[in-house]
């Protein structure tokens, strides 16, 4: 397969992932690319995300969510963007780096089976959930329009969380809604990495331009994964929008509340799904394509140095 020009994606994957034991299983440029690409895609798709968030909280139509945001004023349209910008930048670093490290730990010399990719993706999702859940918590409070007066800034939210006791800071503050976050991130990462490479390899064999297989693979995987886990996304948004000591509903009570407010219909839980498809397609398509491009350039430079 190495000599076939129409299969560059697979050739690259063999060079990057089937490294010899004892060698580094990650590349600093790949980490940097994950950070930069996630930063850019988050900024570009944040308005879409905010509309989706309002739908998840208030179960309203797209037009009503847009009208509500516009009524609050353009100056608030990007309110709450700093936590996701920081968290997504860290996510890009953790997502690809941790996955590759775990994959090479599970199978140092390859080939990497579906089970290896699933396990490495699952564990990288756990790391991601532990590291980034506090950022998402602050972000969801900031984006809830009902709390703008009480919590106008990130600092005001952090001040509220730090006023709790140690256990309260974790369970009611920074890690509120952690269990559904853990399930969503671990399963989502496992699904994404399990099928990203097979789809990309299949498209690369069709003689398409280098960037197309990665873009399509990331878009398809991001869309399918997001739709499969969308009920968990809605549950997390609702749980993490609550703040304070009193009347803090449990995980089960929050799930029941989401189900009841959606009229006990699965279709209403998926309200906003069209925007989720668009946001996930753009975000994961760009992230995967840019990461693949940087990875390819990195290895091209290394080959020139060795020649």
UniProtKB/Swiss-Prot annotation:
Membrane topology value: Multi-pass membrane protein
Name the major location.
Answer: mitochondrion
Q: What is this protein called?
A: Solute carrier family 25 member 53
Instruction: List localization entries.
Output: Mitochondrion inner membrane
Tell me where the transmembrane regions lie. 31-51, 82-102, 112-132, 181-201, 215-235, 269-290
Q: List the GO terms this entry assigns under cellular component, sorted alphabetically.
A: mitochondrial inner membrane; mitochondrion
Upper taxonomic classification of the species? Eukaryota, Metazoa, Chordata, Craniata, Vertebrata
**Which InterPro entries does the entry link to?**
Mito_NAD+_Carrier (IPR052465), Mitochondrial_sb/sol_carrier (IPR018108), Mt_carrier_dom_sf (IPR023395)
SUPFAM superfamilies registered for this protein in UniProt: Mitochondrial carrier
GO function term, MF aspect, one: NAD transmembrane transporter activity
Q: Which organism is it from?
A: Homo sapiens
Query: Which parts of the sequence are annotated with region: Disordered?
Result: 1-23
Q: What PANTHER family would the database entry show? A: SD08549P, SOLUTE CARRIER FAMILY 25 MEMBER 53
Name the keywords, alphabetized.
Membrane, Mitochondrion, Mitochondrion inner membrane, Repeat, Transmembrane, Transmembrane helix, Transport
Per UniProt, the ranges with Basic and acidic residues bias are 8-22
Which protein family is named in the record? Belongs to the mitochondrial carrier (TC 2.A.29) family.
The record's Gene3D superfamilies line, in alphabetical order, gives: Mitochondrial carrier domain (1.50.40.10)
């Amino acid at each position: 397969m190495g000599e076939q020009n129409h299969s560059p994606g697979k050739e690259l994957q063999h060079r990057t992932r089937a490294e010899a034991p004892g060698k580094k299983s990650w590349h600093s440029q790949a980490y940097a690319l994950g950070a930069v690409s996630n930063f850019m895609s988050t900024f570009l798709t944040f308005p879409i995300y905010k509309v989706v968030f309002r739908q998840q909280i208030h179960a309203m139509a797209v037009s009503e969510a847009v009208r509500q945001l516009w009524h609050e004023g353009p100056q608030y349209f990007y309110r709450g963007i700093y936590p996701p910008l920081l968290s997504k930048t860290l996510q890009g670093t953790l997502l690809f780096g941790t996955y590759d490290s775990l994959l090479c730990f599970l199978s140092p010399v390859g080939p990497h089976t579906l089970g290896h990719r699933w396990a490495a993706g699952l564990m990288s999702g756990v790391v991601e959930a532990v590291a980034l859940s506090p950022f998402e918590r602050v972000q969801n409070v900031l984006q809830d329009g009902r709390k703008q007066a009480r919590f106008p800034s990130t600092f005001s939210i952090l001040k509220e969380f730090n006023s709790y006791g140690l256990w309260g800071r974790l369970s009611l503050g920074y890690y509120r809604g952690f269990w559904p976050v853990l399930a969503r991130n671990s399963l989502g990462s496992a699904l994404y990495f399990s099928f990203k490479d097979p789809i990309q390899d299949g498209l690369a064999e069709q003689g398409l331009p280098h960037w197309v297989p990665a873009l399509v693979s990331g878009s398809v995987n991001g869309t399918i994964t997001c739709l499969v886990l969308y009920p968990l996304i809605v549950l997390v948004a609702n749980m993490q929008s609550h703040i304070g000591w009193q009347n803090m509903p449990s995980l089960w009570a929050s799930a029941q509340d989401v189900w009841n407010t959606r009229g006990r219909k699965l279709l209403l839980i998926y309200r906003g799904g069209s925007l989720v498809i668009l946001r996930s397609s753009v975000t994961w398509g760009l992230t995967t394509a840019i990461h693949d491009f940087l990875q390819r350039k990195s290895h091209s430079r290394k080959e020139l140095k060795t020649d």
